[in-house]
Amino acid sequence: MRVSRLMLVTLRDVPAEAEIVSHQLLIRGGFIKRVTSGIYAYMPLMWKVIKKITSIVQEELDSKGCLETLLPQLHPAELWKESGRWDGYTAGEGIMFHLSDRQGRELGLGPTHEEVITKIANEFLQSYKQLPVNLYQIQTKFRDEIRPRFGLMRSREFIMKDAYSFHADETNLKETYLEMNDAYEKIFKRCGLETVAVDADSGAIGGAESREFMVTAEAGEDLILLSPDKKYAANQEKAISKFADPIFLDKKEPCIIQTNGQRTIKELCDNQGFHPSQILKVIILLAVLEKNDLQPILVSIRGDQELNEVKLINAVSKYLKKSVISIKTITKEQLDSQKLLDIPLGFVGPDLKDSYLNKAANWNKKFIRFTDITASNLDSFICGANTIDQHRAFVNWSKVGGLPEIVDIRNAMPGDISIHDPKQKLIAKRGIEVGHIFQLGRKYSSCLQASFTNEMGLEEPFWMGCYGIGISRLAQASVEQNYDQSGIIWPLGIAPFEVIVIVANMKDDLQRELGEKLYSQLKDEGVDVLIDDRKERAGVKFKDADLIGIPWKIISGRDSATGIVELVERSTGISKSLKAEEAIKELLEEISNYKKSILQESL
């Protein structure tokens, strides 16, 4: 390929809308073009990267016996209603684009394909003799993001690989889960990425167990917690840890203390001299359920701990046996709108009576009450007195109506003790999720009535797994992990081109002829090579080559009359002056050795 034919347009200035480095570099390098909020065109260079990632994914999945297919992007609403996910994905802040056709039938643009593939499997897979089967596709998906940002990291249209496996028993599901874990590790190594596999929450997909693959980068939206010995790693949404003991509070006679205007933990500690771990923080929240059912929740947690919203959603969902769309913190304005003027926000105790909800316009009239494990073992604590400007001191659970249901709803934090070794303190890193694997169990097969005939001749639901890789996100995540002040540094395995031949001066016949010769020889050797044959200044060509991140440069310049070229490695900046033949030989060896090492690491 010739740069003169590439439609390459690069920018020197940082685009105003690009917040993180990878987004900036992809726009500046002409890899992507924003069409509208959260929607991007993949330009020729980016499409080459996408195709190389896709090829790696296909090779590794095919080697595991997976079968490639292509599923429809438009899904009938009936399937999603049957699984119970339609309302959660379309109502309020739901992420599914949905529409009605000319006959008035509801359809959704698929963000994921569990419902569709399960129905298809039910028709094609009749017997245990046909199992296991693992089907995958690579195609465009859609999410109606509330706030699209960071380029391809959180877009409304994206390319994804999703796979779905069907099994006769749980043991076989777990075996496939481990096989897919192995395939993912190989895929990411071949893509030149450093990833961390972490325990994760299954979210709206559901299932018993799941694992995320994170590219560690400062721009990552997720916080991951790891032990230094690498034996524990989890997304903070899922992470558990051993928490520090509270500061002991004397067991004195319970009393009421005046705390005028002291609504927060900090205000209470600053004015009364308490430690946050001695205070019971009581929070009123609202769970938004399907069909806009609104359920108040009263949560008690130790004052030095943070509430984990994902864990709380899971706890509420398990308690009610219903899907929870979202959790909202209650504000004074919301209380006013419900005509609940008597609830003393900032001074609430764990024994706040349900009768406070009697006047609620459209909330359920009874609290769900949870206590985090950190608060459950407090023998003496401070808490709100359910009266404005008053707290209770030196009380225990028997004095405040008894202990509510105990659940783990706290955030594990950096510095906490790891659960597997008291010598290991958790450290934090930011991560970009590029892959996620799930053990779905029988969640979808049961609700969609998808079954097979087992060895005993009886019908039973499939055991299922699902496995996703964000192809377009992975491409940008690679940039976030591989760049310098000059531009992108693509790993060789997914670079749009492996080598760029730069003719410094196209007006110089010797430089041009040597450059063309190098280009032809490299093409003949099977190298993915680009030649910069533009009539531009050499400095412009060098800057563009660094910006777009081609791993190797061969420069035909001033010494071309003697057959000398410059060989430059993008990642290190190391430059060598060599005879053209020697440069090609060394380059071929470097490319071959790199590919061998990557393949060896992934074995």
UniProtKB/Swiss-Prot annotation:
PROSITE patterns: AA_TRNA_LIGASE_II. Gene3D superfamilies: Anticodon-binding domain, Bira Bifunctional Protein, Domain 2, YbaK/aminoacyl-tRNA synthetase-associated domain. Signal peptide: none annotated. Keywords: Aminoacyl-tRNA synthetase, ATP-binding, Cytoplasm, Ligase, Nucleotide-binding, Protein biosynthesis. InterPro entries: aa-tRNA-synt_IIb, aa-tRNA-synth_II, aa-tRNA-synth_II/BPL/LPL, Anticodon-bd, Anticodon-bd_dom_sf, Pro-tRNA-ligase_IIa, Pro-tRNA-synth_IIa_bac-type, Pro-tRNA-Synthase_IIa_type1. One of its GO terms (biological process) is prolyl-tRNA aminoacylation. The keyword Manganese does not apply. SUPFAM superfamilies: Class II aaRS ABD-related (SSF52954), Class II aaRS and biotin synthetases (SSF55681), YbaK/ProRS associated domain (SSF55826). It comes from the Bacteria. One of its GO terms (cellular component) is cytosol. Its EC number is 6.1.1.15. It catalyses: tRNA(Pro) + L-proline + ATP = L-prolyl-tRNA(Pro) + AMP + diphosphate. It is found in: Cytoplasm. One of its GO terms (molecular function) is proline-tRNA ligase activity. Catalyzes the attachment of proline to tRNA(Pro) in a two-step reaction: proline is first activated by ATP to form Pro-AMP and then transferred to the acceptor end of tRNA(Pro). As ProRS can inadvertently accommodate and process non-cognate amino acids such as alanine and cysteine, to avoid such errors it has two additional distinct editing activities against alanine. One activity is designated as 'pretransfer' editing and involves the tRNA(Pro)-independent hydrolysis of activated Ala-AMP. Belongs to the class-II aminoacyl-tRNA synthetase family. ProS type 1 subfamily. Consists of three domains: the N-terminal catalytic domain, the editing domain and the C-terminal anticodon-binding domain. Homodimer. This is Proline--tRNA ligase. The gene is proS.
